[in-house]
Amino acid sequence: MVKAIVLVKSPKKLIAAILKQVNLVNESFPVSGQFDAVAVIQVERLVQIKDVTTQIQKISGVERTETMVEVQ
C-alpha cells in the first residue's frame, strides 16, 4: 500500500468534510496555516495517487494542492 498526504487550499469552510467523500480518502481534517485541510489517502499503486489528486483538484473552490508521499 502507498500512503500520501494531500494538502488543500480552499476558502470553503467545509472542505474537509467534502474531501471525505472522495474515493480512497481515508481521513480528512481542517488545519491552520498555508493550507486549509489535509486529506490522507491510501492506494494500492503509486500511479493511483494522481487519480485521487485529480478528483480533489476538480472540487469547486479548491485553489491548489500539494501532495506528499510516504517514504519507507
Model-derived features: where do they sit?
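A compositional/biophysical signature of low hydrophobicity enriched in polar/charged and small residues
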Residues: 1-72
